[in-house]
């Protein structure tokens, strides 16, 4: 018996919706990264994008434990000398709530063309509304 190797044309991508209300950042991000990569499927193949589409609602209500709301730092650079900017979790959550979960999940995915294709299947929304009702996403309890 041979090992199954998934072909890109044969892979089906399902749609799931996840409610992030009250969920812990890291625990939710690991589950989402696993689903985006496709490691939960028996037909997982490392060099093929076998993952599903994930729609996350209520991204503005995600939590962290301890004092990480003030202590967790996020950095970005403008490209100019001395252009490094720093913000903490609570400020980033107030300003751009989708970026918190996006950065956490992106760091858990492989780097390169396949990883970039996987992160595009993650759809993040701060509120309860999302424009993906036509895809009939299934509720995923994490």
Curated annotation (Swiss-Prot):
Keyword field contains Ribosomal protein: yes
Record-level GO cellular component terms: cytosolic large ribosomal subunit
Single annotated GO MF: mRNA binding
Keyword Ribosomal protein: yes
Alphabetically ordered keywords of this record: Ribonucleoprotein, Ribosomal protein
GO BP field: negative regulation of translation; translation
InterPro entries listed in its UniProt record: Ribosomal_uL13, Ribosomal_uL13_bac-type, Ribosomal_uL13_sf
Assembly information from the UniProt record: Part of the 50S ribosomal subunit.
Family matches, as PANTHER family: LARGE RIBOSOMAL SUBUNIT PROTEIN UL13M, RIBOSOMAL PROTEIN L13
HAMAP family according to UniProt: Ribosomal_uL13
Known role: This protein is one of the early assembly proteins of the 50S ribosomal subunit, although it is not seen to bind rRNA by itself. It is important during the early stages of 50S assembly.
Annotated family: Belongs to the universal ribosomal protein uL13 family.
Protein name, entry field: Large ribosomal subunit protein uL13
Species of provenance: Psychrobacter cryohalolentis (strain ATCC BAA-1226 / DSM 17306 / VKM B-2378 / K5)
Gene: rplM
């Amino acid at each position: 018996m041979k090992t199954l190797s998934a072909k890109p044309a044969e892979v089906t991508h399902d749609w799931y919706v996840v409610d992030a209300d009250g969920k812990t950042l890291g625990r939710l991000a690991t589950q989402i990264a696993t689903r985006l990569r496709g490691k939960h499927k028996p037909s997982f193949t490392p060099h093929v994008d076998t993952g599903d589409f994930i729609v996350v609602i209520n991204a503005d209500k995600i939590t962290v434990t301890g004092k990480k709301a003030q202590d967790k730092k996020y950095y970005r650079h403008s490209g100019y000398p001395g252009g490094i900017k720093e913000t903490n979790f609570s400020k980033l959550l107030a300003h751009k709530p989708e970026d918190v979960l996006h950065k956490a999940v992106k760091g858990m995915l492989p780097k390169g063309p396949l990883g970039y294709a996987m992160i595009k299947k993650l759809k993040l929304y701060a509120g309860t509304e999302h424009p993906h009702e036509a895809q009939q996403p299934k509720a995923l309890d994490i």
